[in-house]
Amino acid sequence: RELVTNTYINDRDRSDVRGQLLWKASDALEVRLIADLSNIDELCCGVSNLFNGPTGAVIQSPIVNGRIYPGVANANGAPYDRAAYLNKLPRNIVKNSGFSLHLDWDLGDFNLASITSSRNQKTSFDYDFDFTSGSLGEYNVNTGDIDTVTQELRLSYDAGGAIRGLVGAYYFDEKVKYDNTILLGTAFRNYAGVLTNPTNPTAGLQTFPSLEAALGLPVGTFFRANTGTTINTKQDNDAYNLFGQLDFDINDRVTLTAGAAYTNTKKDVNFAVTNSEAFSGVDLVQLGFAQIFGALTGGRAPTPANFAAFPAQASLADTASVRACVAGQPAFPAGPLCNSALGLYALQFLSPVVPYAESSSDSKTTYTVRLAFEASDNLNVYGGISTGFKATSWNLSRDSKPFAPATPARSPLGGAVNPWYPRYGTRYALPEESTVKEIGVKGRWERVAVNFALFDQEIKNFQANTFLGTGFVLGNAGKQSTQGFELETQFKLSNAWQLDFSTTYLDPKYDSYPNAQGPNGTQDLSGRRPAGIHEWSVSTGLTYNWSVGAVDGFARADYLYESKVQAVDNLPITLASRQVNTLNASVGFARDGWDFMVWGRNLTDDNYLLSAFPAVAQTGSFSGYPNQPRTYGVTVRKNF
């Protein structure tokens, strides 16, 4: 619930229309046209405060006049109260449309299948990016437009003999447009000023007027309301895949399957940006260098002539310009000379990105090999190995930054390494390659079915996407592996009753991930368990089916358990974890093309986090997305 307007959010307002047209041109040729249209227009999605850090006191002070629920400074929040103070209701609009044309042509021993599809998705997300009622951000609109066209052709062969197979081709063409505009609110300047001197807010409010005067800028230039940044990105993705697979019956009970696929992907990316927020464009290293040099030389300007006249002072200022001051350390000369301006670096979260137009081209051949043995008419044992490939992924968000060069940037006079400017990051994630080994058994009898599989998965250059509170960062773990097993069972207790049970055990780890993103910079996650992957998952369901005259009905209950896991890699498990214990139930019936269902979800009213992240522009504060509470509903469907 949004407490400023007393409005419930996370509502559901969705519509969906789908239709099919079937044409049987002959006994051998069938053509099917499927079209759909859907619309979402909701107040979504609700965010809860997980920890109200030191910046919370500033937001809740009269200077900013904002509120954070529940409002206790430097304390845990109450995320499962599902309440928040916002200065804007979040709105989520999604429009989907598309069609597909399926052709199935029986040519005797051969079969030709063709699937042509076209889809469009338009999105618009607008929300309060600081998730408080303080006017830190007035405008944060994300719009997307994705057009996708695909074509698949498959020619399969089955003459009833020992050999079966297929060959095919798949083409994928996707055009993505993504725009994001962020504008600061009326309170951000005061908020930023107080953060520069929290113990003396009055002095802090003079930080930026003094800095503007020193730079010869009009007062009010920095963090002016309704200034910010806009990005306009485009990505054209063209890909094709050529594949084939062959099944060979070695004897009546043993079948060997082998297949291969060649994938080629090309992506062209165009990134444009405009930035009207002036402070994020200030080079604080250059600023600090000028201030330090002036202080050491009695106010002289940082010019080549003065550097030559005062070489010792110039060298000291050059080294100090890239050294951040540490709280509590003695002032110079008792302590090291440092650049106090770098204390403002975290406030440059709308730092400009140089526009670029780049491309990537990737190709890979993957394969699958599988051996299956029919131990009996009811039992099948199999084992196999397969490989996979995922092409380069580009960061289309406003935090897309170039990779750091082999030779690091230098301080103004070149005497020291400059880790501050230019700002480097990750513009894309390298392609990832996977290998999966699996052995298993499948059994099916009159009233019992059992599937069991052991697997070992290895992903090289695992692609990770982490939200740091001010933007998304793409990266690669050198290697990520997972071992585990999966069990699925089905028991027909009678003609009316059915019991389903499944469980999965996963033991994943980052074999190599030395530069992962953490809450306070990079961290080494090598040897650690990836966030969000549960060790144990258990699902069970009981269904009762019945018929009375022309009415078919059912009653079903299902339960899901997922063991405790860290929610995201860059927040500790003590702050953001997830453990699931949910019970769902439904009762429904169908008659004359009408389906009617009454359902309840999360009847245990279980609480857990879907995701979490560092709060935007609020160092030390964290937010998260809680799950849906206990929910009831009715579904009515008509089949024409």
For each feature predicted by the language model, list its residue ranges.
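Solvent-exposed loop segments that connect transmembrane elements
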Residues: 1-8, 44-85, 128-139, 181-230, ...
